[in-house]
């Protein structure tokens, strides 16, 4: 059964695993509140604006009507 307790194999302990263990010490911990969600949303919005600008340059869109573009 899924709820049944079983003996767990701890595996092989290596030097590399010991060195990398501190990187995984925060596993499962959640910061209270919104944390850095607002910062992430801001950067996502800025990235979306960047992508729109690149797309408009590629398509020679409305905002760039007066800018001459030539690939020759």
Swiss-Prot record:
Keyword Plastid annotated: yes
Coiled-coil region list: none
Topological category with respect to the lipid bilayer: Single-pass membrane protein
Modification after translation: Phosphorylation is a light-dependent reaction catalyzed by a membrane-bound kinase; phosphorylation occurs on Thr residue(s) in the N-terminus of the protein.
Annotated TM spans: 38-58
Phosphoprotein among keywords: yes
Positions of post-translational Phosphothreonine modification: 3
BP GO annotations: photosynthesis; protein stabilization
Record's keyword terms, sorted: Chloroplast, Membrane, Phosphoprotein, Photosynthesis, Photosystem II, Plastid, Thylakoid, Transmembrane, Transmembrane helix
InterPro entries: PSII_PsbH, PSII_PsbH_sf
Function description: One of the components of the core complex of photosystem II (PSII), required for its stability and/or assembly. PSII is a light-driven water:plastoquinone oxidoreductase that uses light energy to abstract electrons from H(2)O, generating O(2) and a proton gradient subsequently used for ATP formation. It consists of a core antenna complex that captures photons, and an electron transfer chain that converts photonic excitation into a charge separation.
PANTHER family: PHOTOSYSTEM II REACTION CENTER PROTEIN H (PTHR34469:SF4)
Family per similarity comment: Belongs to the PsbH family.
Assembly and interaction partners: PSII is composed of 1 copy each of membrane proteins PsbA, PsbB, PsbC, PsbD, PsbE, PsbF, PsbH, PsbI, PsbJ, PsbK, PsbL, PsbM, PsbT, PsbX, PsbY, PsbZ, Psb30/Ycf12, at least 3 peripheral proteins of the oxygen-evolving complex and a large number of cofactors. It forms dimeric complexes.
Name this protein carries in UniProt: Photosystem II reaction center protein H
Organism listed in the record: Oltmannsiellopsis viridis (Marine flagellate)
Gene assigned in the entry: psbH
């Amino acid at each position: 059964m899924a709820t049944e307790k079983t003996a767990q194999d701890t595996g092989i302990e290596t030097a590399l695993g010991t060195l990398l263990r501190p990187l995984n010490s925060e596993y499962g911990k959640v910061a209270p509140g919104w944390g850095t969600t607002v910062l992430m949303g801001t950067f996502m919005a800025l990235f979306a604006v960047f992508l729109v600008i690149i797309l408009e340059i590629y398509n020679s869109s409305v905002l760039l009507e007066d800018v001459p573009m030539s690939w020759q």
